[in-house]
């Protein structure tokens, strides 16, 4: 990893998820000579919409989680470190290693972290579904339950948003009747933000796979073998996956930034309110009056828009406002099944599954990686 030739003139991007990585790659295409620094502590980018296919071994690790040193070429300096403090006035960043960096433009795209709502036992006795460690843990649970085939064993998924619904469908297919799968949701319906078509198809898929859906149910405590509900009843489990919420993961910033609904408030061009050269994207940002969904497609589009905005600033022009283009929603409903709406399509079943996966594979960062992955998938048909 090399340092940019002039750190004080660099574009520094904090966070290598969808927003950060796509900003870096798009900016390099627009301004090949621009010094770009990407700060990300992990060694792999994670394409989370395809994490379900990694759980079922339908895709391989290199396809879903490519290494940053394979995605980034010599035009982008990757620093594998963690930001501990950002000083806006003097435009410096302090890293966990003790190093300091200056910037000309700053992009914050640090994503989110799980929200346990302070419920006892969630951190100690549950798994999330956000990274490769979580995938490995769930694979171990599934293998163990498959070998035991204990009729009293069961998995509980808490939270019936997209992650919870997709995960419950996938695990029900993989466990193949060796244990029960239960989806617990505090609200009165699954997928409250989805289209009616996707919600209905998901409900039908859950029923077909034997997933028990328990609505209007809140968890008050989690132990190694039980989930205690708010009404006092107890559910036994052999593994509990928590997908019930997230919080923005915002680094320490001085002076304190303006917040909107607990996120960094941004103007129409994604610059932080009160700043001329600092941007915030994805799950950590919010535009007053414009509730963008917390999704990969928003972060990817914001990455492209931020790259264009920075390119404009560096030649003395004002950025254009960000315009989100809703391209619809695609949901995995288990092995070989999916539902999607958007771009003029309303589709469910095996064809939707193939279209969803092909669409995501071609969106993998780095053209060669996307083509390799799509080619590998086509050869497996």
Task: Locate the predicted segments by residue.
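An active-site-proximal "capping" alpha-helix that borders the catalytic cofactor pocket
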Residues: 36, 295-315, 330
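FAD-site-proximal beta/loop scaffold in flavoenzymes
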Residues: 124-151, 234-301, 308
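Beta1-alpha1 glycine-rich phosphate/pyrophosphate-binding loop at the start
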Residues: 2-77, 156, 165-194
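A Rossmann-like FAD-binding core segment of flavoenzymes
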Residues: 76-86, 173-268, 319
């Amino acid at each position: 990893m090399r340092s940019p030739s002039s750190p004080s003139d660099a574009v520094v991007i904090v966070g290598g998820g969808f927003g950060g990585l796509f900003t870096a790659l798009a900016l390099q295409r627009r301004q090949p000579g621009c010094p770009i620094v990407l700060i990300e502590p992990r060694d792999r980018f994670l394409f989370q919409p395809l994490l379900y296919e990694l759980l079922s071994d339908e895709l391989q690790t290199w396809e879903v989680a490519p290494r940053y040193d394979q995605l980034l070429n010599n035009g982008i300096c990757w620093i594998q470190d963690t930001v501990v403090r950002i000083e806006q006035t003097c435009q410096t960043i302090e890293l966990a290693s003790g190093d300091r960096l200056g910037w000309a433009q700053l992009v914050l795209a640090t994503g989110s972290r799980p929200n346990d709502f302070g419920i006892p036992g969630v951190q100690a006795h549950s798994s999330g579904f956000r990274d490769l460690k979580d995938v490995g843990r769930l694979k171990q649970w599934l293998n163990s339950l498959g070998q035991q085939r204990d009729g009293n064993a069961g998995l509980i998924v808490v939270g019936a948003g997209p992650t919870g619904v997709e995960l419950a469908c996938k695990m029900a297919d993989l466990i193949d009747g060796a244990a029960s799968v239960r989806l617990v949701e505090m609200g009165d319906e699954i997928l409250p933000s989805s289209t009616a078509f996707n919600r209905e198809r998901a409900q039908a898929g859950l029923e077909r796979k034997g997933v028990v859906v328990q609505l209007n149910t809140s968890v008050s405590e989690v132990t190694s073998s039980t989930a205690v509900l708010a009404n006092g009843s107890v559910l036994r489990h052999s593994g509990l996956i928590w997908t019930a919420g997230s919080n923005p993961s915002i680094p320490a910033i001085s002076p304190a930034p303006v917040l909107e609904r607990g996120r960094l408030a941004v103007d129409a061009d994604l610059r932080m309110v009160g700043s001329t050269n600092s941007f915030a994207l994805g799950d950590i940002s919010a535009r007053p009056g414009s509730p963008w969904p917390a999704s990969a497609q928003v972060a990817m589009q914001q990455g492209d828009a931020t790259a264009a905005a920075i390119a404009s600033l560096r030649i003395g022009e004002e950025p254009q406002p960000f315009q989100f283009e809703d391209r619809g929603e695609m949901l995995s409903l288990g092995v070989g099944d999916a539902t999607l709406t958007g771009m003029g399509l309303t589709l469910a079943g095996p064809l939707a599954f193939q279209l969803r996966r092909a669409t995501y594979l071609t969106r993998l960062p780095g053209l060669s990686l996307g083509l390799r992955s799509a080619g590998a998938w086509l050869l497996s048909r």
